[in-house]
């Protein structure tokens, strides 16, 4: 059974890790042993990813940076020939994306409604963080922020209902700057995804650590013609 296999893997790996840990610091040796004990979890996750790739008929697998890079190494080590029980597995690549790099490009417009997607996850919003999310230089809007009574270091509770933030988004100069920034970021992301083989019409598996799937949501909005199947370890 698979359980017996994992028990065997653990029994084989732990003694090897103890031997390999000799000469290391106590902290390093403990970390090495912990990794060996967790080997069945990592291997089981990679095996499940391969099974899902076959069952879901996925065209390509993407492991998101940065946590996904480790699992990409595990996956490639387990399936060096790209096959599982006689089935061909899709290509597996690392995709350098983050919540920040995919959110702004996925926005339809510069509006409070679009921002509420991220505010539903985080109930507070720092003013400086807002500008970083939108890809804007906050220094260019110092006068406007002062007029609206918004300090750069301020943290706003319930941002969706903030009068000051609503006024900010309704200011033509700010709205135009956001629109231009979104266009540029969308163009850059679209070019990167195309270069990475991710286009509309494909079936893609994505691998990451977590449970919210925020990046997957952003990607699905940005490439609506693609099918995404998320595989997470949370």
Features from the language model and the residues they span:
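An acidic- and aromatic-residue-enriched active-site/binding cleft used to recognize and process polar
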Residues: 66-67, 97-100, 209-212, 233
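Short glycine-rich phosphate-binding loop at a beta-alpha junction
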Residues: 58-65, 203-207
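Mature, well-folded catalytic/scaffold domains that follow N-terminal targeting or propeptide regions
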Residues: 1-21, 38, 42, 72-73, ...
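A charged, amphipathic alpha-helical module
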Residues: 147-205, 209
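Extended charged low-complexity segments that act as oligomerization/scaffolding linkers
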Residues: 1-38, 53, 73-145
